[in-house]
């Protein structure tokens, strides 16, 4: 039996996560968000506001799972830092695959994975902890996606791509086969990446050229 869940965050990504959880018949008891707590709100998107993150102190981690609704803003590290902090004190994070997504049977999924509506993850791929595969993303065979990376809506990763930790692939971008994306790399929306990208680099355009420093 699936444990009841607590949603973290109250932005647009959190709304999508809540919708996906409901589509999977996961019971959500409420939401934790500092801004909602500061505003004194008691209800958000049909969910009870439990308080800020500190409200989790009143719940037993063995009896609930967390739904990570933190998106990429205001910082790409906020989601990762929350995951690491609360996993370190015993909380479990739910992995969600939307009913309309296709994930091949042999794909390896970590924890806190979110595969959104219409996404495809093909045979032999590995998604590490905290990865977001957003709406209509296509990840082809034998790709390896590092922890806390985000593949934005409509992006295409061709076969045998390796992405390090904390990679962001923008909406509608295409990464061609066997390319390596170094940890922390940012691929701008609509780009076509044809060669390896260094860790921490920002790439854009048809050839994925790196900006001059």
State where each predicted segment sits.
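Small/polar loops that bind or transfer phosphate-bearing groups
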Residues: 9, 70, 177
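Phosphate-bearing ligand-interacting subdomains
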Residues: 40-98, 102
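Active-site phosphate/pyrophosphate- and oxyanion-stabilizing loops and adjacent acidic/basic residues
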Residues: 19, 84, 191
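Conserved acidic residues
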Residues: 29, 64-65, 165
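Structural signal for interior beta-strand "rungs" in well-ordered beta-sheet cores
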Residues: 95-211
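Hydrophobic, well-ordered beta-alpha structural blocks that scaffold small-molecule cofactor pockets
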Residues: 1-53, 57-60
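Short glycine-/acidic-enriched loop or helix-start segments at secondary-structure transitions
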Residues: 16-18, 41, 77-79, 197, ...
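Short glycine-rich anion-binding loops that position phosphate/pyrophosphate groups of nucleotides
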Residues: 13, 71-74, 209
């Amino acid at each position: 039996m699936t444990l009841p869940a607590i949603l973290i965050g109250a932005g647009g990504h959190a709304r999508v996560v809540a919708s996906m959880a409901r589509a999977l018949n996961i019971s959500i008891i409420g939401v934790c968000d500092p801004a909602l707590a500061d505003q004194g709100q008691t209800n958000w998107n049909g969910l009870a506001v439990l308080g800020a993150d500190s409200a989790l102190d009143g719940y037993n981690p063995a009896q609930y799972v967390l739904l990570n609704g933190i998106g990429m803003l205001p910082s790409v590290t906020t989601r990762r830092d929350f995951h690491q902090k609360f996993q370190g004190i015993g909380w479990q994070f739910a992995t969600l695959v939307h009913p309309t997504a296709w994930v091949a049977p042999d794909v390896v999924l970590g924890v806190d994975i979110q595969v959104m509506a219409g996404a495809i993850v093909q045979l032999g791929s590995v998604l590490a902890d905290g990865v977001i595969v957003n709406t209509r993303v296509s990840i082809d065979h034998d790709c390896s996606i590092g922890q806390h990376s985000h593949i934005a809506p409509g992006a295409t990763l061709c076969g045998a791509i390796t992405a390090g930790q904390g990679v962001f692939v923008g909406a509608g971008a295409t990464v061609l086969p066997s390319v390596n994306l170094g940890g922390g790399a940012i691929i701008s929306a609509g780009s076509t990446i044809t060669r390896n990208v260094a860790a921490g680099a920002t790439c854009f355009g048809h050839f994925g050229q790196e900006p001059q420093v």
